[in-house]
Amino acid sequence: MGKVLWHVAMSLDGFVAADGHAMDWMSGVHVTPGVHEESVARIGAILGGRRGFDALAARVPGKVAKQPYGGAWSGPVFVLTHHPEDAPAEDGVAFLSCDVREAVEIALAAADGKDLELHSQDIARQCVELGIVDEFTVHLMPVMLGSGIRLFDNPGGKPVRWDRVHDGDPALAIDLRFRPAAHR
């Protein structure tokens, strides 16, 4: 069985999407070469949320399932929603109305032995709380948004510790230095 992956890009100030689920803030910024290709090869299914689906569907009606990784990935896309009855039909997208654990089980089964990638901050948060996220990858983008959807919004919750999946000390902090882009 595949793993449950939380794979996300995040601004320096901790946002994974701008207001209204906007993602255009990432244009012109690139991830390490090979990272997307590795993800595309590993992923067998995607599980997202309704608010993100609706925001993307408003920009690219009928083409949400073709958007992951710039169209390089294809496979089953699941959208968890409280209201599947008013969801717009789209090829390659299945709407689920169940609890998060069951949605993960359904999507993992559809992934056919490959990994399931979470495309929703809220669903990912719930999966973290349930202890069912196997791996978390964050791409820290060199931009500050000021507002939007936070990476892990869980007021009053307990801290969640992660071990780095790299050589060396898995608890070692990552030190990054930046300067304003005008200094290039």
Set out the residue ranges of the language-model regions:
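Enzymes that bind and transform nitrogen-containing heteroaromatic metabolites
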Residues: 1-184
